[in-house]
């Protein structure tokens, strides 16, 4: 995450990022991911990303500070988060949607839900 954000920040004045933290995995990494996003991104969209059987409230508590800045939006539904980010994105600012890549399913409460970040973005272009 650090490498890609740093690379984009070298080329662009502003960068927006959308990401989430997986459930039942790497709890200590969650807050580091958010802090990394804060270093490079002027706008952060925090959303779901394979919460598995872990409650999203627990994931948010691990990842986000209690005094959340205005530059961070929390939108639990990943599809809605992508829509909000794309529709509010100013021209000439890149939006980095991180974490899912080519995956076509989300694991939410141990239910497999069809979802593709790529398809979600393509709806707007």
Regions found by a protein language model. Name each.
Residues 1-125:
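ATP-dependent carboxylate-amine ligase
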């Amino acid at each position: 995450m650090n490498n890609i954000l740093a690379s984009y920040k070298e080329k662009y004045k502003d960068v927006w990022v959308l990401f989430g933290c997986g459930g039942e995995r790497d709890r200590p990494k969650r807050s580091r991911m958010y802090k990394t996003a804060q270093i490079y991104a002027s706008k952060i969209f925090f959303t779901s990303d394979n919460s598995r059987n872990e409650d999203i409230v627990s994931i948010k508590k691990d990842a986000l500070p209690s005094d959340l800045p205005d530059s961070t939006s929390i939108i639990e539904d990943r599809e809605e988060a992508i829509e909000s980010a794309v529709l509010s994105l100013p021209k000439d600012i890149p939006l980095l949607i991180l974490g899912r890549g080519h995956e076509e399913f989300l694991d939410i409460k141990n239910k497999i839900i069809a979802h593709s970040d790529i398809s979600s973005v393509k709806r707007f272009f």
